[in-house]
Swiss-Prot record:
Listed cofactors: [4Fe-4S] cluster
Top EC group: transferase
GO CC terms in record: cytosol
Keyword annotations from UniProtKB, A to Z: 4Fe-4S, Cytoplasm, Iron, Iron-sulfur, Metal-binding, S-adenosyl-L-methionine, Transferase, tRNA processing
Enzyme Commission identifier(s): 2.8.4.3
Residues that coordinate or bind [4Fe-4S] cluster 2: C157, C161, C164
Disulfide bridges in this chain: none
UniProt-recorded Gene Ontology molecular function terms: 4 iron, 4 sulfur cluster binding; metal ion binding; N6-isopentenyladenosine methylthiotransferase activity
TRAM domain boundaries: 378-441
Gene that encodes the chain: miaB
Name of the molecule in the record: tRNA-2-methylthio-N(6)-dimethylallyladenosine synthase
Length: 477
């Protein structure tokens, strides 16, 4: 009888990626198969997120439900990972002593050993260390699940924004070696992946060591990934404006595989609030980067993150944010009411904006962005869009579903043989959360770009020219 594993995941795409790696790791090492039913599981893992308010209490409520399962199944192993685990550590077991394993985002690769120790009666295991890149060296080979895949290229953040827990829960910035990233993506391409989404808490801060001892910048990595046969689309998230340098903008001029969509969080349109947030950029600098990006890629759409009701945010500060939203014409946003995160500098500031004021501001902000998103969608009406076909539509399984370059979901009628490839579709209807279209042609009628060899891309780098952060590049001869 096979052993069963249930993983419940909260939070960002990095957590989703980590959970998929946990499943692959425990399958490869111990033969665990995933189940959607916690009652069937031999191991229950909760991968947590600490971004939202009352994250800790949410964890203990979930653990309380699992406690009942363990009462009926004493051999059940319960583990808690993710950012709340990093923050709370032993405190989790103090409040929930039936938890067997507490592990951080950087120690998930040690799960097989920790589970074995628990099952052998060696007691509970707590490991929330930051062993840098060791995690990636211990994971099994990637397995594709469709035409798109996430690939983590770096971990952590060294910016220490006053509201953010990431540096404390995932550590400072650590980049994976360039060769490791390219090898993983090449493996995925061999399995039919056509689109990769490069992940990192501050992904454009990537500075990966190379085989020759030099440093690969994020801009160089984008070109190298684009050169891998079979990879026709590249997305990445999440970016920081201060690291969105000119060499990255240049990539948008000559690398069509990088999609015409960018998520670049600004958080606020007020320089005063940005300073209090310890964001090392101004509104003018942000707008300047977007202006240069649109000169390089005129059809690009932009999304962002916004925090409303940050301590001491005045009506004038909020109006500055609304002005920025209209000037940039954001396509979408992840917008949140500010709530203090324990252990961050902002948690020591008075949370002095009334909750009703916060709610009104958030509703107004989201209303404007939703209207802008609809206008951008309507501008696509009648156009031909290239869709990466992901599978049957959730609205109608007799139809297909895919995404445009600018991340719009499109539903259309077509043969299921199109799944996993590209299709050109004429947009016939615009809805609030999706588009409808008419199939025009399949991939066999397209002239897709032929990839070049990675070494040719490397040879394009100028000798010993520092990039925007002063890191010199090495050109092999």
């Amino acid at each position: 009888m096979s052993k069963k594993l249930h993983i419940k995941t909260w939070g960002c795409q990095m957590n989703e990626y980590d959970s998929s790696k946990m499943a692959d790791l425990l399958d490869a090492s111990n033969g665990y198969t995933l189940t959607e039913e916690p009652e069937e599981a031999d191991v229950l893992l909760l991968n947590t997120c600490s971004i939202r308010e009352k994250a800790q209490e949410k964890v203990f409520h979930q653990l309380g439900r699992w406690k009942k399962l363990k009462a009926n199944k004493p051999g059940l192993v319960i583990g808690v990972g993710g950012c709340v685990a990093s923050q709370e550590g032993e405190n989790i077991r103090s409040r929930a002593p039936y938890v067997d394993i507490v592990f951080g985002p950087q120690t998930l690769h040690r799960l097989p050993a920790m589970i074995k120790q628990v099952q052998e009666g060696r007691g509970a295991q707590v490991d929330i260390a930051f062993p840098e890149i060791e995690k990636f060296d211990s994971l099994p080979e990637p397995r594709a699940e469709g035409a798109t895949a996430f690939v983590s290229i770096m971990e952590g953040c060294s910016k220490y924004c006053s509201f953010c827990v990431v540096p404390y829960t995932r550590g400072e910035e650590v980049s994976r070696p360039m060769d490791d990233v390219l090898y993983e993506i090449a493996q995925l391409a061999e399995q039919g992946v056509r689109e990769v989404n490069l992940l990192g808490q501050n992904v454009n801060a990537y500075r990966g060591p190379t085989f020759d001892g030099s440093i690969c910048s994020f801009a160089e990595l984008l070109r190298l990934v684009a050169a891998i046969d079979g990879i026709d689309r590249i997305r990445y998230t999440t970016s920081h404006p201060i690291e969105f340098t000119d060499d990255i903008i240049e990539v948008y001029k000559d690398t069509p595989e990088v999609v015409s969509f960018l998520h670049l969080p600004v958080q606020s349109g007020s320089d005063r609030i940005l300073t209090m947030m310890k964001r090392p950029h101004t509104v003018l600098e942000y707008k300047s980067k977007i202006r240069r990006l649109r000169a390089a890629r005129p059809d690009i759409t932009i999304s962002s993150d916004f925090i409303v009701g940050f301590p001491n945010e005045t009506d004038e500060d909020f109006e500055a944010t609304m002005k920025l939203i209209e000037e940039i014409n954001f396509d979408m946003s992840f917008s949140f009411i500010y709530s203090p995160r324990p252990g961050t500098p902002a948690a020591d500031m008075p949370d002095d904006v009334d909750m009703e004021v916060k709610k009104v501001r958030l509703a107004r902000l989201q209303h404007v962005i939703n209207n802008q998103s609809m206008q951008i969608g309507r501008a696509m009406l009648g156009s031909t869009q290239r869709i990466l076909v992901e599978g049957p539509s959730r609205l109608d399984p007799m139809q297909l579903c895919g995404r445009t370059e600018n991340n719009r979901v499109v539903n259309f009628e077509g043969a299921h043989t199109l799944i996993g490839g590209f299709a050109d579709v004429e947009i016939t209807e615009v809805r609030p959360n999706s588009l409808r279209g008419r199939f025009i042609r399949g991939e066999d009628e397209m002239n897709l770009r032929i990839a070049t060899a990675p070494r040719e891309i490397l040879a394009r780098r100028p000798d010993n020219v520092p990039d925007a952060l002063g890191v010199a590049a090495f050109t092999p001869h």
